Amino acid sequence: MRTLWIVAVCLIGVEGSLLEFGMMILGETGKNPLTSYSFYGCYCGVGGKGTPKDATDRCCFVHDCCYGNLPDCSPKTDRYKYHRENGAIVCGKGTSCENRICECDRAAAICFRKNLKTYNYIYRNYPDFLCKKESEKC
């Protein structure tokens, strides 16, 4: 519970669905979303280019692609509701955009959990200049 409170305090200044996404990540992985995923590999965090470094980074690549398929939505600022049923993330009722954004975030949080065993600390705070190649196609 203490960790949840600390993450919530850290995310107070975060806009829109990034808050919900962070809470999903915490719930699925037990990891602090800011320190564990914000600057991981070539795709976790702002932007992205090159080849994903591992399965966790590929989760972020797929998440970026998912957001890219929502041209009429604002994934980083539109808020949505979700809850958990028997431990599973369930996106709540909302607009079409809110539901699709929630589903993108849900899939990424689950992907992070499924790849916890291969999470590699050498990719935390990974330098952007090492991600030189053109981005893969979604």
Swiss-Prot record:
Cellular component, GO annotation: extracellular region
Major subcellular site: secreted
Result when mutating residue 39 to W: Is 8-fold less toxic than wild-type AtxA, is similarly enzymatically active on anionic POPG vesicles and on zwitterionic POPC vesicles
Residues annotated as signal peptide: 1-16
Entry-linked Pfam families: Phospholip_A2_1
Outcome reported for the amino acid change (mutating residue 39 to Y): Is 16-fold less toxic than wild-type AtxA, is similarly enzymatically active on anionic POPG vesicles and on zwitterionic POPC vesicles
Reported tissue expression: Expressed by the venom gland.
Any one GO molecular function term: phospholipid binding
Compartments reported by the entry: Secreted; Host cytoplasm, Host cytosol
Biological processes per GO annotation: arachidonate secretion; lipid catabolic process; negative regulation of T cell proliferation; phospholipid metabolic process
PROSITE patterns per record: PA2_ASP (PS00119), PA2_HIS (PS00118)
Residues at the catalytic site: 63, 105
InterPro entries assigned: PLipase_A2, PLipase_A2_Asp_AS, PLipase_A2_dom, PLipase_A2_dom_sf, PLipase_A2_His_AS
The protein's assembly and partners: Monomer. May also bind to 14-3-3 proteins gamma (YWHAG) and epsilon (YWHAE), and R25, a mitochondrial membrane protein.
Protein's name according to its UniProt entry: Basic phospholipase A2 ammodytoxin A
Species per Swiss-Prot/TrEMBL record: Vipera ammodytes ammodytes (Western sand viper)
